[in-house]
Amino acid sequence: MDRKNDGSAQEPRCSFCQKGPDSVKRLISGPDVYICDACVELCNEIIAQEHVQESVDAGKLLSPAEIKARLDEYVIGQHTAKKILSVAVHNHYKRVFFAETLSDEVELEKSNILLVGSSGSGKTLLAKTLARVLNVPFAIADATTLTEAGYVGEDVENILVQLLQNADYDIEAASKGIVYIDEIDKISRKGDGPSITRDVSGEGVQQALLKIIEGTEANIPPKGGRKHPQQEFIRLDTSNILFIMGGAFIGLDKIIEQRMHGGAMGFGVKVASKKETPLSDLLGNVHPNDLVKFGLIPEFIGRIPVITHVNELAEDDLVRILQEPKNALVRQYQKLFELDHVKLRFTSNALRAVARQAIERKTGARGLRNVLESVMLEIMFNLPSMTGVKECVINTAVVEEGKEPIFLYQTEAKTGT
């Protein structure tokens, strides 16, 4: 540093903001330079912000509109659910990426999500697609297999084992992953009041799940399996893991309807019937108290701030699902046939017949593959042995009556017959 002419040293000042020792808490000295505590904090914020910007540039932090647009590529319908999910997921990962820049004055809570809707309506697909869009590790668990620690069944922490395995044991990646717990309605407690007897697969599991969905340091066996005292554990912080839970919640609509319309009696009172209030409208009005009445404990519901529903899929929805998504079943079969140099075509009535069969089986979208597999089995068995086939047409008779499809051979295809 420069010296004064009288030989006395200049008062040390921060080389960045020029503040003296009386204006700052601390000055850190280096070779001919000083930096104050305020500038150190500012530098840390700049570095953290650059880290966040790198994450954004890498596509990890998408806007809600971008997330929904990506979901639209794979999931048909469910626009309200997709909007709610997109906002919740965006806020969750914004909280994760900006954690280093957030002040201690404001604590952002996790945006865990509950999806209510019938089987085959797309709950699992939504969660799985979110993980694909965000490029984070993903794990699916079945709530019906979970029990309290010490009982026959899977410990709740085994959910995290699968997530860690899917992340190739990258703890940092796993700590920002997504876990989908299906059939969450099946662990509702028995009865309205607190359980007096041990309920190892109901209220007990809800109690066991509380900590990991809220955020805790979980001890995980290195290669899965049961814990034992001599074993070394992997510690996984679940504070930034997004938990999405789904269930059919059969009977929840009656609880909602009773709250909305029940209790009023007498002349002049309009009684709402089920026909007047569609199931989707009822589920769209679900409140946390309805879920408590169903059997989820208040503490559990309190850790799931985002609750939405998915609609039952109609015939038109299923027909679109067969054709429109990037991984649509019809597209997949057409690609398989294309590898054998055969064009595959479904008539519109044939696709509707497939959709109707899935509805009759009450399996929703997941039943479409089973129906198509049955329809296509004999065709795909025989086709590789056939010669000269250029086009295969699946009509209603093939789907409903098991008849042979229309095969167009090379000469016929050329003449257009």
Swiss-Prot record:
Keywords: ATP-binding, Chaperone, Metal-binding, Nucleotide-binding, Zinc. It holds the Pfam family ClpB_D2-small. Residues 1-55 form the ClpX-type ZB domain. GO terms for biological process: cell division; proteolysis involved in protein catabolic process. Zn(2+) binds at residues 14, 17, 36, 39. Coiled coil: none annotated. CDD domains: RecA-like_ClpX. GO terms for cellular component: HslUV protease complex. ATP binds at residues 118-125. Belongs to the ClpX chaperone family. ATP-dependent specificity component of the Clp protease. It directs the protease to specific substrates. Can perform chaperone functions in the absence of ClpP. This is ATP-dependent Clp protease ATP-binding subunit ClpX. It comes from Oleidesulfovibrio alaskensis (strain ATCC BAA-1058 / DSM 17464 / G20).
